[in-house]
UniProtKB/Swiss-Prot annotation:
The record marks D91 as: Stabilizes the basic form of H active site to accept a proton. The active site is at H20 (proton acceptor). Gene3D superfamilies: Peptidyl-tRNA hydrolase. Belongs to the PTH family. TRNA binds at Y15, F64, N66. The record marks N10 as: Discriminates between blocked and unblocked aminoacyl-tRNA. NCBIfam families: pth. The keyword Zinc does not apply. Disulfide bonds: none annotated. This is Peptidyl-tRNA hydrolase. Hydrolyzes ribosome-free peptidyl-tRNAs (with 1 or more amino acids incorporated), which drop off the ribosome during protein synthesis, or as a result of ribosome stalling. Catalyzes the release of premature peptidyl moieties from peptidyl-tRNA molecules trapped in stalled 50S ribosomal subunits, and thus maintains levels of free tRNAs and 50S ribosomes. HAMAP family: Pept_tRNA_hydro_bact (MF_00083). The keyword Coiled coil does not apply.
Length: 189
């Protein structure tokens, strides 16, 4: 049973609407749908929404993406959670915008935030949702791309992706991962 949904991103206004913050965007939508209360937990280095009616935490680590493992490890320790009780939501360069993938476990795939979590909690056996953001055009550096906002023409699709992913998370919470795979793993158009 999932007890914490963790959306990855970077803290600060300058990163708010960037590709790397799609996990934060989705966490906020799920927290709103579930009518959760927000608070900052210093030891966990995170903004945490407490969803009392659902026995759920929605977490936005404030350690910056590449150090997400610090916050996740503290969260697991402080709330006595197991890795299979968290669901991590994050951006994925290797999937085109509009693609969403729910996985039970797996490698980092080169994502530094996920790599930080794997190294910190000493396992890759935790569920995750990868949200495609696509790759940059040839000339643009990856770091510049992930820290850039979505283009105007991408925002309509992005809104659909965020809505779909939020519904996917609600489905996982209600029915579990196995029963949610077909619903979640989609290409949104």
């Amino acid at each position: 049973m999932i007890k914490a949904v963790i959306g990855l991103g970077n803290p600060g206004k300058q990163y708010e609407d960037t590709r790397h913050n799609v996990g934060f965007m989705i966490a906020d939508v799920v927290a709103s749908l579930l009518k959760c209360n927000k608070k900052y937990i210093e030891r966990c280095f995170s903004h945490i929404y407490v969803c009392e009616d659902h026995y759920l935490l929605i977490v936005k680590p404030q350690t910056f993406m590449n150090n997400s493992g610090v916050a996740v490890k503290n969260l697991l320790e402080d709330y006595d959670l197991k890795p299979d009780e968290i669901l991590v939501v994050y951006d994925d360069l290797d999937l085109p915008l509009g693609t969403v993938r729910l996985r039970k476990k797996g490698s980092s795939g080169g994502h530094r935030g996920i790599q930080s979590i794997i190294e910190s909690i000493k396992t890759d056996e935790f569920p995750r949702i990868k949200v495609g953001i696509g790759r940059p055009e040839r000339k643009e550096q990856v770091v510049d791309y992930v820290l850039s906002p979505f283009k105007k023409e991408e925002k309509i699709l992005l809104d659909k992706v965020i809505s779909h992913t939020a519904q996917c998370i609600l489905n996982v919470l209600k029915y579990g991962i196995d029963k949610s795979l077909n619903l979640c793993n989609k290409k949104i158009v």
